[in-house]
Amino acid sequence: RDTENKFADLLEKYETKNKIDQELFKTEIKNLDLYGYGIKGFMLSMIECALDLSNNEVSSKTIGAMLDLGKEMITQPVELLNGVEEVLKSLKDKYRLIVLTKGDLLDQERKLEKSGLSEYFHHVEVLSDKKEKNYSDLLEHLQILPSEFLMIGNSLKSDVLPLVEIGARAIHVPFHTTWEHEKVKDPIENNGYMTISTLTDILEYV
């Protein structure tokens, strides 16, 4: 949200903050098929949105400031959830641990390296999207039956519900910020997945 707020500040002479937020979100969603998920696509969407809202009058200086916002996102430290390393240490020798993420390959590789957690994982996969077919294809490639797979994630839409649909299990760990595109209206609780409040709660179940 911090980047979106700064973006709105850059365009405050053209529109209200609420309108800017709405238009940026629309532009992001429209561009997902072109750019995929990731910071670079977000940067391009910021520029496109700024041009649209300003009727192509936005200055090169302002566009430069938007690029700087994107670079700040790329270089910012990785925020680890409390207990994540404790959980990984406990599970590493018991299970085959896999990172499944979506977005720009370079961005995600950089994040994993910064996190210092790569040693705990047996496999890393960066998907173009997180839908049922993406997961089914990957599990088939890795020779893992859905019934033998447990997903742990913070997004119901991307990390939990698609896995439940293909017969896998999932644990939902809510995060304090969720992108609007990842929100699910009226999710059905206990429909093949469980929700816990902290990562370390996982150790009670696996």
Could you say what each language-model-derived stretch is?
Residues 4-8, 43, 47, 105:
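An amphipathic alpha-helix signature
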Residues 13-17, 55-57, 116-119, 143:
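Short helix-capping segments at alpha-helix termini
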Residues 60-79, 84-115, 125-128:
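Substrate-recognition element of Asp-dependent hydrolases with the DxDx(T/V) motif
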Residues 1-23:
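Active-site neighborhood of HAD-like aspartate-dependent phosphohydrolases
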Residues 17-72:
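A metal-dependent, Asp-based hydrolase signature
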Residues 85, 89, 105-206:
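Asp-based, Mg2+/Mn2+-dependent phosphohydrolase catalytic module
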